[in-house]
A protein has these predicted regions:
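Generic hydrophobic, amphipathic alpha-helix propensity
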Residues: 21-32, 49, 74-85
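Short hydrophobic clusters on alpha-helical segments that form packing/core surfaces
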Residues: 28-36, 78, 82, 106, ...
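Alpha-helical DNA-contacting segments of helix-turn-helix folds
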Residues: 71-78, 120, 136
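Short linear capping/connector segments at secondary-structure termini
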Residues: 87-89, 120-127
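Amphipathic C-terminal alpha-helical segment
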Residues: 146-150, 167-185, 197-206
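Amphipathic alpha-helical packing segments from all-alpha helical-bundle domains
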Residues: 80-83, 97-104, 108-112, 127-153, ...
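N-terminal intrinsically disordered/low-complexity leader segments
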Residues: 1-23, 152-154, 204-206
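Helix-turn-helix
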Residues: 27, 31, 35-69
Length: 206
């Protein structure tokens, strides 16, 4: 199916193939992240990003046709880190351990750079990223389902449905904490695990 014009304009013009060009793209993305953190969305223009990255605007436009395409690339960079952390969490030996590690990965993603995470959440809602959002949800859901299939997991009538519910609980609580500007990762982890534990206890006894 052909890409819609709205989706097509979010694609990079080209991908870096050499170390030098990869360094340029990373410098541009990190410059955008720093501006978002320190000055906010309004200040994050392509001119400001290029200046902060130490490259020409022309060099920036070689890779990104507009600011939205650059923002999507930044979102993808942060998402790749989250998914790598979640996949590592899915290697634990116990159901509880895997779920706890996945909660920690989600909280750490939000708290590592909280201002950036909050603004990226805002941009994710604004931009048409349906395919990306589904890909992320599917990956995390698969990891949660795997955790619920281990021998020590609670007895559940529908593990896949329970994994969707857990995904909603974790995502909702972590995003809400980010919107409130919470910074205490340990406290948030405890609250999320209480909610997850309460759900699993209730579902297994239903």
């Amino acid at each position: 199916m052909p890409k819609s014009p709205a989706t097509q304009r979010l694609k990079p013009r080209k991908l870096p193939v050499q170390a030098r060009s990869a360094h340029t793209v990373e410098a541009v993305l990190e410059a955008a992240a720093r501006i978002l953190e320190t000055q906010g969305l309004a200040a994050c223009t392509t001119n400001a990003i290029a200046e902060r990255a130490g490259v020409s605007v022309g060099s920036l436009y070689q890779y990104f046709p507009n600011r939205d395409a650059l923002t999507v690339a930044l979102i993808e960079r942060e998402t790749a880190q989250l998914l790598a952390d979640v996949e590592r969490a899915g290697q634990g030996e116990t159901s509880h351990g895997r779920i706890l590690d996945m909660v920690r990965a989600s909280v750490a993603h939000q708290m590592r750079r909280p201002v950036l995470a909050r603004l990226i959440d805002f941009e994710e809602k604004r931009l048409p990223l349906g395919d990306r959002d589904q890909r992320v949800a599917d990956t995390i859901h698969a990891q949660l389902t795997g955790a619920l299939q281990l021998p020590d997991a609670p007895r559940l009538a529908d593990r896949e449905l329970a994994a969707y519910d857990l995904l909603a609980i974790v995502h909702g609580m972590v995003d809400a904490a980010g919107e409130r500007g919470e910074l205490d990762a340990a406290a948030l982890e405890r609250r999320v695990m209480l909610a997850v534990g309460g759900y699993l206890n209730g579902a297994s006894s239903a």
